[in-house]
């Protein structure tokens, strides 16, 4: 009787489990896969429907393609000022230093940014930035970013679970070690276990 009453869950195990397939989730899954981890990616709707696709402005990166006075230090100062100096100093610094490489990486993965007449990535002005700094794809930068991340991620061996709703997190102390998710397409629960 106990076996009859206990629900049977499909069990899946990964080194890394990422919940959310927006820009941050896809990028985290790609990075984990590049470190040779087995990766599961859970998204609540279809892949490509994350809110990131609605981002229009662009990616702030001090590449100096339009104004050669732009540097990561100026970008950092703009970010701190924009956050009224209560931002996390180290995160703002890392963002300013690493964002040009992130834009180049997206381009290597197939993102098609708008171009200057001489072929460099075009950058435009945006509120709070001292120099034109936003790498963009017209007014659909988020959509292009997600497309490039998805295309690259799919070829990295990341297993994607679409239309899954996470119902519970399982923790070992303060560490999340798994989730219970409902597969809305098939109508049953799955138990995902992960090391990270």
Per-region residue spans from a language model:
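N-terminal Rossmann-like FAD-binding beta1-loop-alpha1 element of flavoenzymes
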Residues: 16-41
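Extreme N-terminal leader/targeting segments of oxidoreductases
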Residues: 1-16, 34-36
